[in-house]
């Protein structure tokens, strides 16, 4: 059976705003309190999805979560009508209101870790919801994600859904943003590469300025849940020094597709040993690693972070070459653009660039790779996916019109307490669940 890497992009939610909630994510803190444009943000994401679908790539859509999360506020002691809860939290805990209104679920690379059936002992695709323990505004996503994913991948014969790991410091898990797969054809076994920032039960190198969000113990637990072969699994520590420069997830400093790993030279601790280990394991699959290492002398870590050069999508083309999807910021930076221009003019695997304006997401710290969850599927598994979430020209028009109808074109912090915004969001999401045939996946629908 043929295999595909299918990208499931998150739709930006109606409460997209700049709150500076993500310590360690420098774009998030830099743009705190700016006025956002949720309508533009959603359209920028949709345009990227459509462009890639038009190129022939399999493209799916994942819906935003309900925000503000009134149910979370009630668990924290706020009571009364929904309007009273909003008024009370806005008056007495405004930062909390911002956190429970975050549209961060748009970054579906953090929704879950996914292992293809070719790598799992039971021959099924495994999903483990990420607990996102390190940040409150993200940790509250896990409960709804655990309902949404089975509504999309809703065939028990092909898909296995695991709950998030216990939400404790020892098991901090950030999902696919710290996970890569290296091999040949998508429907053949490959090497799964889990990247962690620290060890929870043993001493070792750790960052000093910013938190390491992913633990080795969490990555190991996910690998066990997914029934992966230890001979085809590697656990790699990210360089603590780059975490302290704003590389809060590995997808800010590395990206892979098939046998190609594109990364900064400072991305990993003990990089030479890491590459040797991967090469050895890939040789067992009769595959050869193509390692594209970007020197610090050509692109600094600071420039990589500010432009999200590595938070790109690396896509395989029919001619065997690779396409790199990058944000506008990468083109705007002279040193990054110089490097990329030389890269695609050479004889390496990457021979094409596609530039997208994703500034609304970028200002909150999420580039092209953040916005998508990669799911490797064979033909039978693709047919088992909820077909209504797969992007078609007709669905693009429907979603674009849906955004025009429901989204505001500017949002400030004071707007989060507006009860009309809550109702606008619920009305929009209720309609979206019908468009995507998801059923009652949101708390307001189930209560």
Curated annotation (Swiss-Prot):
GO terms for biological process: arginine catabolic process; arginine catabolic process to glutamate; arginine catabolic process to succinate. InterPro entries: AstB_sf, SuccinylArg_d-Hdrlase_AstB. Pathway: Amino-acid degradation; L-arginine degradation via AST pathway; L-glutamate and succinate from L-arginine: step 2/5. Its EC number is 3.5.3.23. The keyword Hydrolase applies. The active site is at residues 174, 249, 370. PANTHER family: N-SUCCINYLARGININE DIHYDROLASE. Homodimer. This is N-succinylarginine dihydrolase. It comes from Yersinia pestis.
